[in-house]
């Protein structure tokens, strides 16, 4: 799975991005770059602006102020080009329970104009990739929560995206199902070198998957860096929850505003899952 990898072109670029719903400021002057092949996380509580930010990146919301580029392409000027580069798993379930797993993925293959001669093999490939090949011909309504999430991953991967976007990919799942989804995401990211952008409020998820994270609170990025670097900068034994509280004055479910801090990584964080 590959996409635009031109030297010097970031996978995602946000410059001065601000978004309001009426008088309510939900994204506040965000600057951000994500490198090709990186797994990057937006970590923060509900209402932090994470989902709005990725909806701007995925063209699901109009950019009101600032600039959003995906592999150098402006989302406002060429939204259809950007959409062809993306695989997206939203928070809300995006499967049809009355169809089999295979039929669900096949529908997405047609939606993304996967060539007809390739569809059967491509669908089988991504179902096997997420360990659903043996359950592919069961109705999706019979799937567990973890299987549903893995099916959604297969749907998002069938067009071989350059950028995979995951909005709270394991919210509501039990620990076993959560670990299974984490393992599939890490395996696919490592195998194909695709860029992954995810939102989460689970610090364990950020630590398990992300090369770097941006801590978001009240629409703004409060700190940015590799999880290990952010923790080390605060002190031995610090967790990402501690880091978040330090920079924002709040917990991952709190709402008090903190200051901006940027901790740069000098190395890629080692994968915790493989």
Describe the predicted segments one by one.
Residues 106, 110, 117-135:
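Conserved ABC ATPase "signature" region
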Residues 179-192:
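Helical segment within the ABC ATPase nucleotide-binding domain
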Residues 160:
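Conserved catalytic motifs of ABC-family nucleotide-binding domains
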Residues 139-143:
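Conserved ABC ATPase signature
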Residues 164-167:
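Catalytic Walker B motif of ABC-type/P-loop ATPase nucleotide-binding domains
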Residues 224-225:
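ABC ATPase "signature
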């Amino acid at each position: 799975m590959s996409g635009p990898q031109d030297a010097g072109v970031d996978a995602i670029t946000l410059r001065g991005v601000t978004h309001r719903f009426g008088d309510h400021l939900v994204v506040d002057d965000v600057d951000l770059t994500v490198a090709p092949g990186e797994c990057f996380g937006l970590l923060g509580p509900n209402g932090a602006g994470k989902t709005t930010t990725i909806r701007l990146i995925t063209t699901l919301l109009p950019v009101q102020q600032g600039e959003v580029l995906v592999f150098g392409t402006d989302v406002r000027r060429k939204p259809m080009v950007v959409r062809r580069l993306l695989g997206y798993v939203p928070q809300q379930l995006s499967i049809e329970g009355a169809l089999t797993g295979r039929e669900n993925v096949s529908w997405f293959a047609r939606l993304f104009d996967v060539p007809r001669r390739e569809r059967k093999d491509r669908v089988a490939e991504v179902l096997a990739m997420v360990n659903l090949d043996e359950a592919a011909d069961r109705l999706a309504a019979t799937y567990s929560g973890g299987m549903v999430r893995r099916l959604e991953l297969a749907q998002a991967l069938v067009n071989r995206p350059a950028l995979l976007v995951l909005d709270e990919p394991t919210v509501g799942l039990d620990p076993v199902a959560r670990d299974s989804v984490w393992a599939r995401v890490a395996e696919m990211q490592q195998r194909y070198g695709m860029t992954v952008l995810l939102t989460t409020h689970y610090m364990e998820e950020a630590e398990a998957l992300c090369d770097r994270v941006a801590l978001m609170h009240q629409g703004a990025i409060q700190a940015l860096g590799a999880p290990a670097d952010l923790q080390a900068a605060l002190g031995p034994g610090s967790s990402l929850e501690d880091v978040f509280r330090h920079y924002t004055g709040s917990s991952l479910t709190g709402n008090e505003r903190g200051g901006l801090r940027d901790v740069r990584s000098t190395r890629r964080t080692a994968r915790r899952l493989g």
